[in-house]
């Protein structure tokens, strides 16, 4: 089973914020695959189906961003999902709005959700789909920026990135991730 994890914060007040780009991709995949989420005992929302002949699961942790690993690790253990079958989708300050970048592994880059996953999974070697949100201007605090909504100027580019990231995830269901990475990072 492949597990796609979108990082974000639960609650209406965080919907459509920069920090919830991962949730937006997961919601797009659920829409494409016509599946609904259910709350799990693992502190997350989960949906599963068979797509292209492969079992897949979508997860949105409900633990708040900096505790994401507390949802994902128990879920992996319960369903016997290997770290090689996990793809994490999240926002990235170091990419401009609308840009996506796929990686096989890496450090947290200062992202608290990724820090939590690295801690709970015991490795940095899990696949990632990063959605660019850019950096704040005019000395705005990073926390305020990531918890803010996209500007009108950013919105179109970011929505395009959400769709492209969902395309990459769909392709990764049956195509080796390195091949998907080479195609979408080009």
Curated annotation (Swiss-Prot):
One matching Pfam family: Pept_tRNA_hydro
Record site feature (Stabilizes the basic form of H active site to accept a proton), residues: 91
Primary location group: cytoplasm
Residue numbers marked as site, Discriminates between blocked and unblocked aminoacyl-tRNA: 9
One Gene Ontology molecular-function label: peptidyl-tRNA hydrolase activity
GO biological process: protein quality control for misfolded or incompletely synthesized proteins; rescue of stalled ribosome
GO CC terms of this entry: cytoplasm
Catalyzed reactions per annotation: an N-acyl-L-alpha-aminoacyl-tRNA + H2O = an N-acyl-L-amino acid + a tRNA + H(+)
Keywords, in A-Z order: Cytoplasm, Hydrolase, RNA-binding, tRNA-binding
Localization annotation: Cytoplasm
TM segment ranges: none
EC number: 3.1.1.29
Lineage: superkingdom: Bacteria
UniProt cross-references to SUPFAM superfamilies, sorted A to Z: Peptidyl-tRNA hydrolase-like
Amino-acid positions noted as binding tRNA in the UniProt annotation, renumbered to this chain: 14, 64, 66, 112
Coiled coil (residue ranges): none
Active site positions: 19 (proton acceptor)
Function per UniProt: Hydrolyzes ribosome-free peptidyl-tRNAs (with 1 or more amino acids incorporated), which drop off the ribosome during protein synthesis, or as a result of ribosome stalling. Catalyzes the release of premature peptidyl moieties from peptidyl-tRNA molecules trapped in stalled 50S ribosomal subunits, and thus maintains levels of free tRNAs and 50S ribosomes.
UniProt family annotation: Belongs to the PTH family.
Subunit annotation: Monomer.
Protein name: Peptidyl-tRNA hydrolase
Gene symbol of the encoding locus: pth
